[in-house]
């Protein structure tokens, strides 16, 4: 019972606590951790705009007093872009949309926390901080500026504006001119004001437009964790406006003037000269002396002439430096531009005369002369009467002479003068004085003092006019001319124009043409134009003469000439028909061997003279063929005997008349026909003997047979005469023709008998015909002479005379090749047996045998000489 009582208070308190809890359930709340916190309710959260999408940016954090679990939520105002998302369980917030501070610098978001019963919501603002993600941008482009050229240096001419949407250093802009070297402009780095550089001016006459490239650069800043600088560029076009801004310009500076002791007051000492720098619309020039004159000089305001207004004795200084001002006067009379120079005036009492040139009539600074071209080198131009004089004395009167102009043509003598001299101009280069190159020469003769500080000088203009002479030979345009003309060209046809030129003028440049040479007969030439044409009677024929060669002469009026060679080729045309040879009327054709006909075309060139052959008519037509190119006529290949011919034709005697055509290849083509009588025979008919073969071969040409026969007879007569002459000899004393005597010299009787051994014999050839052959002993001894008809010794018993020596041996011929001539001139070899009788031994062998017999008889008898 006690135990039950103890449980009652516990149950009571539990029920009370539950009831109390139901009645007092508290809502959850966010932790407020302050600025910079990464968890809490996102109050005062700042987020850089370069935060990448998907990045974790915050953690919502809170608690429930009752200890219940909480969840988190995140919403946006209706119509707003959702930038964040939250995990309801852990409160992690993620960026889901790219931030851009320049478009939205703060984001309103509603965060909530709930314990399942109670939900607490808070509206917070998330600040978007800047990142340097924008480039500078120029405003109001393009930039075109017009600036007067007289704008002072350093002046502001334009302001360039650029903006950068970034904040802080990323939004600050610095301006820079690119390519500063050589630029006439500068820019304020912070304001963007464009100015003309100090010390630099614009000039419309030099440059009308300038292009300036300007760079705008921000101050840099962080972007995604890295320092980033952005730039932009633009071009400023500056047009320079022309104004009257160019000052006058002096010419001929420096200026020097002299006042001599004899100078009179009011004399002009020197003249200064200036012109307006603005050439387009120049203003009037006004001269004035600013200072330095000390009242001794004045200047002509319009001409610039400076005049001395005191006498030389009143001048207190030796040198006056006159500061001369020149001004431009506007049409309104205002002085708008100025320029300054210094004119030096020296007061001297010596050397007050410059060199002066004189002609025949006094002082003169221009001389002229007319002369022929190409004078000899070293010749003096006597037509120029020039004297030079310096009235000063001593060293002040010494000066040099010099020719100024084309160099190396003339030279002046003397080159150094004291007081006065006669000026001589001499030819130095005759070839350079050429009328065809220059009609006149212009020189300046300069005289300049040597040892004076003033270096006074004077000039004289020398003009030399040239006259032409005939110094040029006519020249042909070519050394040779090649022409071609058809052979049928009528008389008077143009062949070629041989033109020449003569550089001389007038009559000396006129040319007359002529031709000469062995080949010029058919041609004429126009004496003025050089056109070569054929004689009216000329009939050119390439078959007679196809090439002509002659000379053309170009001659001027004084006989100077040049030559050119002319080559004329006469072009062949087809004007001849082929002509058959005379021996084609009758032909003998051996079976297996062709006969040839031949025609000649007298045209000079191919293809006009190429002949083609053809058979126009033959009955029957199946017997003969002809070679188109050679003209050889032969039987058809299947005809090999007379029997075949007689079987296929009606003509049993094998004789035909064939009409043959010869046609050339010219255009137009010409042709000729001829009738050839052909007698067909076989080769076996020629074996009946040499004479029969020869007569058969010569059947077509009987004159050939007669000629051969006459030749053989003439050869036999010549041989007979030669042999007869050799056997007889003329005795000079008796003037009779007698047989040749042979003299034999013997040894004395005391010698042993001689034998007929031929080694002791020696033939000796003599120039004397009476001693044609002699045999003498080798040993010396008393001569045994034969005195011919005057010898009175014992005569030898008579004996028969020696027969004449036989003819020379002919070679033994067993077989000789005989040839059968054909129409074409070719030879057909034929083998003919011919037996030749052997000849007797030669004459020399017979003579030796006879001499040996005589020697043997004399050895037995006496020591006399035998005839």
Curated annotation (Swiss-Prot):
Its main location: membrane. One of its GO terms (biological process) is homophilic cell adhesion via plasma membrane adhesion molecules. It holds the Pfam family Cadherin. Residues 729-867 are cytoplasmic. GO terms for cellular component: cell-cell junction; plasma membrane. It is found in: Membrane. InterPro entries: Cadherin-domain_protein, Cadherin-like_dom, Cadherin-like_sf, Cadherin_CS. Residues 777-825 are annotated as: Disordered. It is a single-pass membrane protein. Keywords: Calcium, Cell adhesion, Membrane, Receptor, Repeat, Signal, Transmembrane, Transmembrane helix. SUPFAM superfamilies: Cadherin-like. This is Cadherin-related family member 1. It comes from Xenopus laevis (African clawed frog). The gene is cdhr1.
């Amino acid at each position: 019972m006690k135990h039950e009582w103890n449980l009652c208070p516990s149950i009571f308190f539990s029920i009370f606590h539950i009831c109390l809890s139901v009645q007092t359930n508290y809502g959850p709340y966010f932790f407020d951790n302050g600025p910079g916190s990464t968890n809490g309710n996102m109050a005062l959260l700042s987020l850089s705009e370069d935060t990448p999408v998907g990045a974790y940016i915050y953690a919502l954090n809170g608690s429930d007093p009752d200890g219940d679990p909480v969840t988190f939520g995140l919403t946006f105002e209706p119509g707003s872009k959702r930038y964040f998302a939250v995990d309801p369980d852990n409160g992690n917030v993620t960026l889901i949309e790219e931030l851009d501070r320049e478009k939205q610098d703060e984001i309103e978001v509603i965060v909530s926390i709930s314990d399942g019963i109670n939900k607490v919501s808070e509206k917070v603002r998330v600040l978007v901080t800047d990142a340097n993600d924008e480039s500078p941008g120029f405003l109001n482009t393009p930039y075109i500026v017009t600036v007067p050229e007289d704008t002072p240096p350093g002046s502001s001419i334009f302001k360039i504006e650029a903006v950068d949407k970034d904040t802080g250093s990323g939004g600050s802009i610095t301006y820079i001119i690119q390519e500063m070297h050589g630029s006439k402009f500068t820019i304020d780095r912070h304001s963007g004001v464009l100015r003309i550089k100090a010390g630099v001016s614009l000039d419309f006459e030099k440059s009308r437009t300038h292009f300036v490239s300007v760079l705008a650069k921000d101050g840099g800043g962080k972007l995604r964790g890295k320092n980033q600088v952005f730039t932009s560029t633009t071009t400023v076009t500056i047009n320079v406006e022309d104004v009257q801004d160019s000052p006058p310009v002096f010419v001929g500076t420096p200026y020097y003037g002299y006042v001599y002791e004899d100078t009179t007051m009011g004399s002009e000492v020197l003249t200064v000269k200036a012109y307006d720098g603005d050439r387009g619309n120049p203003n009037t020039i006004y001269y004035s002396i600013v200072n330095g004159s000390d009242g001794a000089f004045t200047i002509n305001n319009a001409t610039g002439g400076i005049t001395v207004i005191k006498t030389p004795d009143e001048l207190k200084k030796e040198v006056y430096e006159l500061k001369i001002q020149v001004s431009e006067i506007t049409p309104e009379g205002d002085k708008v531009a100025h320029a300054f120079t210094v004119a030096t005036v020296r007061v001297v009492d010596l050397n007050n005369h410059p060199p002066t040139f004189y002609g025949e009539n006094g002082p003169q600074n221009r001389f002229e002369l007319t002369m022929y071209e190409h004078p000899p080198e070293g010749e003096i131009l006597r037509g120029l009467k020039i004297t030079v004089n310096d009235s000063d004395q001593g060293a002040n009167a010494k000066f040099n002479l010099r020719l100024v102009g084309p160099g190396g043509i003339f030279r002046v003598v003397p080159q150094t003068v004291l007081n006065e001299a006669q000026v001589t101009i001499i030819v130095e280069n005759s070839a350079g004085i050429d009328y065809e190159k220059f009609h006149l020469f212009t020189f300046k003769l300069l005289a300049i003092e040597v040892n004076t500080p003033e270096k006074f000088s004077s000039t004289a203009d020398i003009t030399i006019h040239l006259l032409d002479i005939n110094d040029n030979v006519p020249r042909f345009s070519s050394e040779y001319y090649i022409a071609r003309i058809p052979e049928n060209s009528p008389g008077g046809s143009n062949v070629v124009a041989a033109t020449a030129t003569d550089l001389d003028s007038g009559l000396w440049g006129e040319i007359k043409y002529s031709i000469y040479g062995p080949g010029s007969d058919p041609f004429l030439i126009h004496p003025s134009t050089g056109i070569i044409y054929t004689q009216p009677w000329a009939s050119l024929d390439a078959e007679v003469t196809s090439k002509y060669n002659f000379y053309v002469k170009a001659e001027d009026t004084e006989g100077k000439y040049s030559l050119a060679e002319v080559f004329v080729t006469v072009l062949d045309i087809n004007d001849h028909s082929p002509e058959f040879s005379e021996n084609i009327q009758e032909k003998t054709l051996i079976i297996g061997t062709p006969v040839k006909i031949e025609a000649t075309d007298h045209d000079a060139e191919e293809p006009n003279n190429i002949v083609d052959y053809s058979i126009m008519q033959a009955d029957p037509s199946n017997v003969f063929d002809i070679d188109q190119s050679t003209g050889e006529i032969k039987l058809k290949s299947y005809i090999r005997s007379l029997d075949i011919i007689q079987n296929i034709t009606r003509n049993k005697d094998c004789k035909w008349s064939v009409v043959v055509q010869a046609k050339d290849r010219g255009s137009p083509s010409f042709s000729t026909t001829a009738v050839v009588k052909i007698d067909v025979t076989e080769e076996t008919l020629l074996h009946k003997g040499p004479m029969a073969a020869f007569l058969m071969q010569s059947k077509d040409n009987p004159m050939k047979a007669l000629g051969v026969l006459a030749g053989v007879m003439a050869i036999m007569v010549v041989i007979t005469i030669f042999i007869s002459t050799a056997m007889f000899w003329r005795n000079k004393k008796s003037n009779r023709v007698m047989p040749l005597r042979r003299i034999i010299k013997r040894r004395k009787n005391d010698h042993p008998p001689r034998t007929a051994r031929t080694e002791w014999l020696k033939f000796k050839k003599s120039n004397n015909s009476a001693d044609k052959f002699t045999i003498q002993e080798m040993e010396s001894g008393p001569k045994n002479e034969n005195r011919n008809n005057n010898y009175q010794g014992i005569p030898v018993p008579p004996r028969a005379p020696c027969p004449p020596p036989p003819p020379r041996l002919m070679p033994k011929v067993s077989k000789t090749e005989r040839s059968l001539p054909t129409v074409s001139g070719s030879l057909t070899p034929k083998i003919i047996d011919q037996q030749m009788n052997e000849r007797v031994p030669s004459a020399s062998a017979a003579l030796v045998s006879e001499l040996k017999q005589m020697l043997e008889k004399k050895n037995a008898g006496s020591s006399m000489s035998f005839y």
